[in-house]
Amino acid sequence: MIDLPKICRNTLLVVVLSSITLFGCSNVSEKTEDIPVNSAQSDTLEKVKNGQLEGVLIGIGATKKEVLDKIGNPIESGNSEYGFTVYYDGFDLQFEDYANSIDEVKDTSKVVLMNAEPKTVGMTGKPEEIKKNLGEPSREFMDDTGDNTFILEYENSGNLLRFAFDSKESPVKYVTLRVQ
């Protein structure tokens, strides 16, 4: 005698298991292993997100008071494109205000831009080496408005990290981090 309910139950079980196997193994998968994130990339871009550069003790958004308390008096100072600039060994910081001297800059004036020497931030390579370390930039271009420098830009959380090179084959000339 044929046990019809048992055959139906077994058939249903086979269909359910086959469906789970078939649809549970879809072609859509995360490709995290295809995009390796090295620690240098992760650390550098995380610092940029927070307005900081490796080797610079202060970040974007720090006040004049915080800068002087943490780093001390600058080697040199004066006005520049973005505001009053203070120069230290290996980097400079630009405040949002203009002034004739550091004493005239408000204590609450904030750092809006920093320039650093490549050695200070530990990024001394050619453009391809920088891309290898940090990934593809948000933008790369030849700046023909002045000294024909080659630029790599990385945007992260409202901050812009810029690497300037004399050419596509030369090492980093300087590194800039600024508010967008």
Question: Positions of the model-derived regions?
Answer:
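Bacterial N-terminal signal peptides that target proteins for export
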Residues: 2-12
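N-terminal short leaders/motifs
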Residues: 39-42, 47, 106-121
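Bacterial N-terminal signal peptides
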Residues: 14-21
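N-terminal low-complexity, Pro/Thr/Ser-rich intrinsically disordered segments
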Residues: 32-58, 63
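Second-shell loop/turn segments in exported
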Residues: 51-58, 112-121, 150
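A cross-family detector of function-defining hotspots
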Residues: 44, 62-107, 121-180
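Bacterial lipoprotein signal-peptidase II cleavage site
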Residues: 22-35
